[in-house]
Design a protein with these regions (language model features):
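Short, Lys/Arg-enriched N-terminal segments with co-localized hydrophobic residues
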Residues: 1-18
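Charged, amphipathic alpha-helical regulatory modules used
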Residues: 18-118, 683-684
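Short, hydrophobic beta-strand segments
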Residues: 21-23, 64-71, 238, 483-488, ...
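Conserved catalytic cores of very large enzyme subunits
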Residues: 112, 116-470, 491-494, 498-642, ...
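Contiguous, well-ordered alpha-helical segments that form the cores/surfaces of helical PPI scaffolds
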Residues: 234, 474-487, 506, 660
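Core of folded catalytic or high-affinity ligand/protein-binding domains
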Residues: 466-470, 474-477, 668, 676
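Long, charge-rich boundary regions
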Residues: 650-685
């Protein structure tokens, strides 16, 4: 409902509250006027048809809240704040909004201005604009389908459902492909209904790469998050027989560029993709017969292809180090190196790449208390703690649904209502539980009743689908642990209060573990990326409580909350202490974590990074982490500089600065304002 749709700027009503300290109301198109409470009541009556007495009651409650914010320093009010508060108050009275969508001219203009800012992987294209316009309509429609309880919690800022527009027609978050499925079956673009051109199982290395790229591209329309390939180098190794280094290099280079230049993702984005590169053969593959050319099972096992797998790893690393035709990073696929049981000093090229472009991620399954795990996108994890078989737990499935709880909002709500923090948190956990299950039911309806995703559920000769929904994770995410602890009176997350952080983590994990056990569903707890949600949810609290009392970071115009249970980026804690603390907390969220270590402008030595990586693996609980250092690139002469350099010293033109936004490296010019605030406050080591 657009409650302000009926409020005209030129209307003035006798009897409005006369205030000496006026509040300015700013509309979405930038126009301003003085706050007049009576307009709220009149608009409510006109749109909902309720009696004037109830409308006045709601109007007074809203006005009281707004002037309380005025006392706390509020000078300017956004129409979105009024809209959200009206919706919340109507829900409390049992009045639901009409299930239609109002689109204003200013909505369209706002999208034209900012449609590339919600996702740092988005660029300005016609496809992106088309997608953003559709997304706005779909998102507004989907809000009419939420339960009153969910809508109220969402409007308040307690919970956040990601990719809301895509709930209508996608639903799934992430997918990790088992390449053996298409290596044995070939490529059927529409699944098993025999529509479209069918490719037989690949017989050559370059064809195997092509079928992997095509499969991920075809899966992308069904996925809101990332697509990935597990055990990439070992799965491709059996196809390399009698090939020269140059031939393999050229095929892999073509694959890497194709993954970036095929804009098949939502809104003409590059595929948000990842590949796992194993430094040593995973234990579960050592005795498995390899699938080779033509989809034939070989007499050799994957352990017999160590040399070829290492060559693939080295070539991909070297291609990434050289960059694209202008010297920029090749952003996708994300490169995830499984480092367990490896001598990291033998992989100097990987750490050279990390020092130059910050692209590699490092994964240690043993630190997540499992034998193996695949990682999707920038943190979602599939450890083999479901059935115990990595072939089932770690590939051919993914993350189906995830939702975020804003811990600062929970703490503020508990204080506002004079309630116990854990009581409010438990309410939100069960609210998320029910919402996730409803969303999963809708995915099943889309897939099996409406046949939206026949490509994803096509079956092999044994009747096993390419994506096994029953093995996918259902996860609860969270935001703002550090600010939550501040609100509760413990100060920002640190060594002194990490026991309180772990207490909250264990409370949430206890619930997901119980659901997993009782429902036989793969529930888990993980660190939400919150690329845009960190700013959006902080903004809701700033609007409700004022900047100071929201405990948000950044500024009042560009606030953000710290991601998950990370130590605040501006905390002066030394790097070793940060590693110890965040490493100790990662195993409490086995469904996905990341530790970001922001390095200074000096060029890190590969040997030093390898040594630090080894220590993190061997002496902490961190199972997924990355080293990040900013670098700037001149768009004219293509010179690269370490650090955030605003102007090229040679050409004197503005440079592009690259860094890791939440999990992946991208141009900071595409970041939203909340993440820009975080970027400015990051402490580098």
């Amino acid at each position: 409902m657009n409650i302000l749709f009926y409020i005209k700027k030129e209307l003035f009503f006798k009897g409005d509250y006369i205030m000496t300290d006026k509040i300015i109301v700013t509309h979405s198109d930038g126009k301003q006027e003085i706050f007049r409470p009576r307009l709220i009541g009149q608009a409510i009556v006109k749109e909902t048809g309720i009696d004037e007495e109830l409308a006045l009651k709601i109007q007074k409650r809203i006005t009281k809240k707004i002037y309380k914010l005025k006392e706390e320093g509020l000078e300017e009010l956004q129409t979105t704040q009024i809209r959200a508060e009206v919706s919340s108050q109507l829900l409390k009275e049992g009045i639901s909004e009409e299930p239609y969508v109002i689109i204003k001219e200013s909505d369209i203009m706002n999208i034209l201005e900012d449609y590339d800012k919600n996702n740092a992987n988005q660029v300005r294209t016609a496809g992106a604009l088309e997608y953003s316009l559709f997304e706005m309509i779909a998102k507004r429609y989907m809000t009419t389908q939420y339960s009153n309880e969910w809508r109220e919690a969402r409007e308040y800022g307690l919970v956040y459902n990601h990719d809301a527009a895509q709930e209508l027609y996608k639903g799934l978050n992430c997918f990790t492909l088992d390449p053996r499925f298409v290596f044995k079956k070939g490529l059927r673009t529409y699944g098993d209904n025999h529509v479209g051109v069918v490719s037989k199982p690949p017989k050559h290395f370059d064809t195997a790469l092509e079928i992997c790229e095509q499969t991920l591209g075809l899966a992308t329309p069904y996925i809101a998050g990332g697509v990935s390939i597990a055990c990439f180098n070992y799965m491709l190794a059996p196809y390399m027989e009698n090939l020269s280094y140059e031939s393999v290099y050229q095929s892999l280079q073509g694959f890497m560029f194709q993954m970036n230049q095929s804009h098949k993702n939502r809104g003409s984005q590059s595929m948000f993709s990842s590949i796992t590169l194993d430094m040593v053969c995973p234990e579960f593959l050592k005795n498995q017969k390899a699938i080779g050319p033509g989809g034939v099972e070989l007499t050799k096992t994957y352990a017999d292809f160590d040399k070829e797998a290492r060559l693939i790893l080295d070539i991909i690393t070297n291609i990434s180090f050289n960059g694209d035709g202008e010297g920029k990073p090749i952003f996708f696929p994300n490169l995830i190196y499984n480092i367990d049981n490896a001598n990291l000093r033998d992989f100097e090229n990987v750490f050279d790449l990390s020092a130059k472009f910050s692209l590699p991620y490092f994964c240690s399954a043993k630190n997540n208390n499992v034998d193996y795990q695949s990682t999707l996108g920038c943190r979602s994890a599939l450890p083999n703690n479901w059935t115990g078989d990595p072939n089932i737990d770690c590939m051919g499935t993914g993350n189906s649904v995830y939702t975020t709880i804003s811990l600062p909002a929970v703490a503020l709500k508990a204080k506002e209502d004079n309630r116990n923090f854990y009581d409010v948190l438990e309410e939100m956990l069960y609210l998320v539980h029910d919402y996730n299950l409803n969303r999963l039911d809708w995915i099943k309806k889309l897939w099996y009743d409406y046949h939206v995703a026949d490509f994803m559920i096509q079956e092999d000769d044994n009747g096993v689908p390419m994506y096994r929904l029953e093995d996918a994770t259902i996860v609860v995410g969270y935001l703002g642990m550090s600010e939550c602890l501040e609100i509760l009176g413990y100060g920002p997350l640190s060594r002194e209060n990490n026991d309180k952080c772990q207490e909250i983590m264990k409370f949430m994990k206890k619930h997901t573990d119980e659901w997993k056990q009782n429902e036989n569903l793969r529930w888990g707890l993980f660190q939400t990326p919150c690329e845009s949600a960190a700013g959006k949810l902080a903004t809701k609290m700033v609007n409700r409580f004022g900047f100071k009392n929201s405990y948000a970071k950044g500024t009042s115009n560009a606030p953000y909350y710290t991601n998950s249970n990370h130590i605040a980026v501006d905390n002066s804690i030394d790097i070793i202490e940060r590693i110890k603390l965040e490493g100790a907390n990662q195993p409490l969220g086995p469904a996905g974590n990341i530790m970001n270590l922001y390095l200074g402008e000096s060029y890190a030595q590969a040997s030093a990074l390898a040594s630090l990586c080894e220590k993190i693996r061997d002496y902490t609980g961190a199972y997924f982490f990355a080293f990040t250092s900013e670098f700037s690139l001149c768009p004219q002469c293509f010179s690269t500089f370490k650090g955030n350099i605003s102007e090229c010293p040679f050409c004197h033109v503005e440079t592009d600065t690259f860094s890791r936004i939440t999990g992946y490296v991208t141009n900071t010019k595409t970041w939203n304002k909340g993440k820009i605030s975080e970027f400015k406050e990051r402490k580098r080591y």
